[in-house]
Every structure is written in C-alpha cells, then in structure tokens.
Amino acid sequence: MASLKDLRDRIASVKATQKITKAMQMVAAARLHRAQEAAQSARPYAKRMADILTSVAADVDGVDAPALMRGTGRDDVHLLVVCTAERGLCGAFNVQIARRAREQIKALLAAGKIVKIITVGKKGADILSRDYKSLMIDHIDLHAVKRIGFAEALVISQRIVDLFNEGAFDVCTLFYSEFVSVINQRPTAFGLIPMGAPKAAVEATDVVEQKETSKDSQSIVHEAIVYEYEPDAASLLEALVPRNLSVQIFRALLENVAGEMGAKMTAMDNASRNAGEMINKLTVAYNRQRQAQITTELIEIIAGAEAL
C-alpha cells in the first residue's frame, strides 16, 4: 500500500499534468478556429479550380491534353504521397491516415505493382518506415513551418512533377485527413495523376441553357455555351494543370491541419477528464488512509491511557 507521502506526490504530479493538458486544449481550440476557416475557404476555390480545368479540357482533344492529365497510359508504378502531422498528442489522427495508406500499399503489392512513397510529416514517416522503409523515396519536412501556406504545397507539387517528368511513376495518390467535424476526421485517398481524361469530363461539366420553343409541345432545347480562349485552350490547359495540382495539395494540407487541431483538442480534453478522475480516486484513497492512520493513533493513545 502506498504511503501518504507517495499519494500526495502522485496527486500533485497528476494535477501538474492536468494543467498542461488543459493549456494544450486551449491552444488547440484557438488554432482549430483559424485552421477550420482556412480549410473551409479553400474548398470552394479548389472545387472551382477543378471545374474550370474540366471545362477547358472539354475543348481539347485527348492527344493534346497535358501529360499530367493524360498520364502515361500505364499503372505499373504507383507513387503514394502520405500527409500526416509533424507532432503527436492528437489521438489516432496520424495512425488512421497511415492505416489507410497501408491498406493501399498492401493491395498494390498484392496486385504486383511497384510502390513508391513520399511522406509529408514526421509521424507518418515514423509509422510507415517500420514496414515499408525500402519503398520510401523522399520525405518532406514541415517541422519548422509555423503556418502552412501555398509555398509548402508548391514544394510538394514540384517534387511530384519532377518525378513524373523523370518517368519515376505512372499513378500518384495523395493521402490526407478530410476535416468533417471536431470529433470526426476522415482518412482520404485522392488521385492526383492522372487528373482524368477530358472526354470523361465533358458530360459532367456541360453548361446548358434551356429555352422553350413551343407552347403546345413544351419541348426543351439544350444549347451548350461555347467559350473562346486566348491563348488557345490547349495552352491554357497546359498552364492550369500544374496550378490545379498545387491547389489540390494545398487544400489537403489545410484539411490536415484542421483535422490535427480537432483531434488534438479532443485528445487533450479526454486527457484532462481522465486526470480529473484519477485525482478524485487518489484523493479518496489518501483520505481513507489518513483516516485509518488517525483512528489507529487514537486507539493507541486510548489504550495507553487505560494502561496507566
């Protein structure tokens, strides 16, 4: 049985830990607000960027589309870009992303594909290096970055483009955590390269005007809006494709930051609650032992007085 001094020391230690977890929870809550706003602001921009790309691609023949959009026509070599946090103390946030990537790696290897991995964030690199260190070809360190910006997305996208131009891979997939709510972050796999065939994009993004041509038949004629591009659509698409790649990566990074802060706030809140419960249990144990000690001392005093 622990002595009273040991119990006092443990209570003091847990209280000190609780102060730290509460402070970390408050910091995460403040950062979450900014990160959530940034992620939500990036979503419509990234979606509109993809819509514009698809619309322009509809006016370009498949053979004239940029290589990043067409791909190599093969799927033998897969590049997986796994984005996690630089630090821990955020529950299962990093583990869930790594688990999603592991599932993909196992499926690709079982299908006889070649897998290459680029990690963004220290925690993902630590987890994946345990089993797939030989597959990891690069690591992008963001430890010194205080606030994720578009410059970090450009670094990642440029590295991917360089590898693609070198013929290092056929298909590229980005793994990150989509921010749903403070308590819900969804591990997501997003295909970066190839971006999709223009022919498939036409049906999804045709803009039509509906005009009534006959009051009797109420028939509707759909007329597609035709755009003119300066310079030509192919040149515009060539410039938009790498930009879209950077934008989608930037959106994923912002989603990751928001998810990390949400997971960290939840984890620190749980830690603070657990510390409070532990303090209560230790305090009860301390009071019981102290009461028993006082009772024993009183009995000894009474017994000694009776002996006299």
From Swiss-Prot:
Main location group: membrane
Cellular component aspect of the GO annotation: plasma membrane; proton-transporting ATP synthase complex
Family from the record: Belongs to the ATPase gamma chain family.
Record's subcellular location: Cell inner membrane
Record keyword Transport present: yes
Stated name of the protein: ATP synthase gamma chain
Keyword set, alphabetical order: ATP synthesis, Cell inner membrane, Cell membrane, CF(1), Hydrogen ion transport, Ion transport, Membrane, Transport
GO molecular function: ATP binding; proton-transporting ATP synthase activity, rotational mechanism
GO BP, sorted A to Z: proton motive force-driven plasma membrane ATP synthesis
CDD domains, alphabetized: F1-ATPase_gamma (cd12151)
Presence of the UniProt keyword Cell inner membrane in the record: yes
Record note on quaternary structure: F-type ATPases have 2 components, CF(1) - the catalytic core - and CF(0) - the membrane proton channel. CF(1) has five subunits: alpha(3), beta(3), gamma(1), delta(1), epsilon(1). CF(0) has three main subunits: a, b and c.
Topology versus the membrane: Peripheral membrane protein
Taxonomic superkingdom: Bacteria
Known function: Produces ATP from ADP in the presence of a proton gradient across the membrane. The gamma chain is believed to be important in regulating ATPase activity and the flow of protons through the CF(0) complex.
Matching InterPro entries: ATP_synth_F1_ATPase_gsu, ATP_synth_F1_gsu, ATP_synth_F1_gsu_CS
